[in-house]
Regions:
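Conserved alpha/beta-hydrolase catalytic His-Asp/Glu region
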Residues: 142-199
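Short glycine-enriched nucleophile-adjacent loop
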Residues: 90-101, 107
Length: 263
């Protein structure tokens, strides 16, 4: 099984949390204290992320990752689940809902990738700066992240709240990025692709972006015409590329509102 997972069982529905490229399942920590009150949590680590070994034979494109997660859901014999994905994880969630509608109850995409009219044909020079910085600074990160200068350098493009962000969240993010052998394979697997699949209107779908997302900016990477026609589109103020960090309570509320639309 290419997907590493941790299932936290409770009463209520099952929420499946899918992280982004170069991230890991611990990116969801700020969300969990509230979300755990509403159901079971299935935390995933994609290949080459979060300590999950990278198998070079595994296809890393979003549709293939969606299929791998579908196999896991079937293996665990879960009822229809509620998908929550960030960035690449949001794209994977959308693909999964489109391909396996019987397994999915709802989708909440947090700054999902793939919503661009013109697919990227190659890696854009400089856009892997966060990866290179994390790799170079991993040894000094525990100390460096206590300084505002290091926080600004590493996270000002990710969150407008970089000054007040929890230290452990920042350290987890740097560690995950520096150790993510799947970062470049996942990136390359998105080239010449975009999300253009159809999701049944039976599956409530919400797309959430922050107004301060500089990773997937609105001008090029937030094309509403590619989202399901029935999807609710929300823009949160003073929120960056990781809404679950900047506004965890609002995100949980949005998730529950999406879940409540299931018929």
């Amino acid at each position: 099984m290419p997907i590493k997972y941790q299932l936290k069982e409770s009463n209520g529905p099952v929420f499946v949390l899918i992280h982004g490229m170069g991230s890991a399942s611990n990116a969801w920590k700020p969300l969990l204290p509230e979300l755990e009150n509403y159901g079971s949590i299935l935390l995933l680590d994609l290949p080459g992320h979060g300590g999950n070994p990278l198998d070079p034979e595994i296809k890393m494109d979003p549709a293939s990752m969606a299929n791998a997660i579908a196999n896991l859901i079937n293996q665990l014999d879960l009822p229809p689940v509620h998908l929550i994905g960030n960035s690449l994880g949001g794209w994977i969630a959308l693909e999964l809902a489109a391909a396996k509608p019987d397994l999915i109850s709802s989708v909440t995409g947090l700054a999902p990738a793939g919503l661009w009219l013109t697919p990227f044909l190659h890696r854009i020079p400089g856009t892997d700066l966060s990866k290179r910085m994390a790799k170079a600074s991993s040894g000094i990160a525990p100390t460096a992240l206590k300084s505002l200068a290091a926080r600004r350098l590493g996270f000002s493009r990710i969150s407008p709240h970089w000054e007040e962000m929890d230290y452990q969240t920042l350290l987890d993010a740097v560690t995950a990025m520096s150790e993510s052998d799947g970062y470049y394979p996942a990136w390359d697997a998105t080239l010449n692709r975009r999300f253009d699949s159809m999701i049944s209107d039976r599956i409530p779908t919400t797309i959430v972006f922050g107004d301060s997302d500089f990773v997937l900016p609105s001008r090029t990477c937030q094309e509403r015409s590619l989202a399901p026609t029935h999807a609710k589109w929300i823009v949160l103020e003073k929120v960056g590329h990781a809404p679950m960090w900047d506004e965890p309570s609002k995100v949980v509320k949005i998730i529950n509102e999406t879940v409540s639309l299931v018929k």
